[in-house]
Amino acid sequence: FLKDLKLYESDEKIPLLKDLLVEISGKIPLVIEIKKHKNIGILENKLVDLLENYKGKYLICSFEKNILFWFKKNKPNLKRGLIFESNPKKFEKYNKTLFLYKYYKSRADFISLDYKLLDSSIYDFCVKNSLDLITWTIRNKENFEKVKEKVDAVIFESLFKL
């Protein structure tokens, strides 16, 4: 099913992960995000099997603490990251509480933080606790300039001239 879908406004098809792994052949590190789903363990086991012989570097990340905890329990040497974004305006006051809950439940190795939270107490917590930080999603040079000294890595949505 997925292999027949086309990328938005193009003739390019969405590659399967197994094909992508062969294509890049370890040339670049991968950040693999696992979206929320039911039956935690089934998809994760399939992913572990798929990555077993992959020679390149990769990280697993998710918004979901239970997915990350599954990897902590079943693949403890695999680096796992908690993705966190700000809550809607009326719930912003709960950001740090929710973050701390997810962080301590997931036992994440690094944090992938929405760039809008880089001036928050969540960012301060990460720095104080020497957590590796990735930020997302940077779409222009101005935002890149603001964040580049604060984080260990940046996720871009589109390319722009640095």
Language-model features: locations:
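C-terminal active-site rim and adjoining tail of enzyme catalytic domains
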Residues: 12, 83-85, 90-162
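Metal-dependent phosphodiesterase/phospholipase catalytic core, i.e.
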Residues: 1-88, 106-109, 113-116
